[in-house]
């Protein structure tokens, strides 16, 4: 995959230090380090400590990963352990396929 030229701004909403929250953060960090190679900013928001942020951003369930930039805003709700689902949700997997097809032509 060619280096990404975009900077991704992501928010991960979690509910405390639960096993689901810890697993979501660990999985997401692995994906980001492998796929985004330093061109991302990740903000982790604990909705138990900052319920107003969850309300403002219309977060109804955790964990929720929101891609703020580049547009459009996308949200992945629930289990983040499926790498492919996360990449599709962030529009990254589609870009990989498009680049591979362009190189094949």
Curated annotation (Swiss-Prot):
Keywords: Biological rhythms. SMART domains: KaiB. GO terms for biological process: circadian rhythm. Signal peptide: none annotated. InterPro entries: Circ_KaiB, KaiB-like, KaiB_domain, Thioredoxin-like_sf. Has 2 forms, fold switches to a thioredoxin-like fold (KaiB(fs)) when bound to KaiC. Belongs to the KaiB family. Key component of the KaiABC oscillator complex, which constitutes the main circadian regulator in cyanobacteria. Complex composition changes during the circadian cycle to control KaiC phosphorylation. KaiA stimulates KaiC autophosphorylation, while KaiB sequesters KaiA, leading to KaiC autodephosphorylation. Phospho-Ser-431 KaiC accumulation triggers binding of KaiB to form the KaiB(6):KaiC(6) complex, leading to changes in output regulators CikA and SasA. KaiB switches to a thioredoxin-like fold (KaiB(fs)) when bound to KaiC. The KaiABC complex composition changes during the circadian cycle to control KaiC phosphorylation. Complexes KaiC(6), KaiA(2-4):KaiC(6), KaiB(6):KaiC(6) and KaiC(6):KaiB(6):KaiA(12) are among the most important forms, many form cooperatively. Undergoes a major conformational rearrangment; in the free state forms homotetramers as a dimer of dimers. When bound to the CI domain of KaiC switches to a monomeric thioredoxin-fold (KaiB(fs)). KaiB(fs) binds CikA, leading it to dephosphorylate phospho-RpaA. This is Circadian clock oscillator protein KaiB. It comes from Cyanothece sp. (strain PCC 7425 / ATCC 29141). The lineage of its organism: Bacteria, Bacillati, Cyanobacteriota, Cyanophyceae, Gomontiellales. The gene is kaiB.
């Amino acid at each position: 995959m060619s280096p990404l030229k975009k900077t991704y701004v992501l928010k991960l909403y979690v509910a405390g230090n639960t096993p689901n929250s810890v697993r979501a953060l660990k999985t997401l960090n692995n994906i980001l380090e492998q796929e985004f190679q330093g061109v991302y900013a990740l903000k982790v928001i604990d909705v138990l400590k900052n319920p107003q942020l969850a309300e403002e951003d219309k977060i109804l369930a955790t964990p929720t990963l929101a891609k703020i930039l580049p547009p459009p805003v996308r949200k992945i709700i629930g289990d983040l352990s499926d790498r492919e689902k996360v990449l599709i949700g962030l529009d990254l997997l589609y870009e990989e396929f498009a680049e591979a097809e362009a190189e094949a032509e």
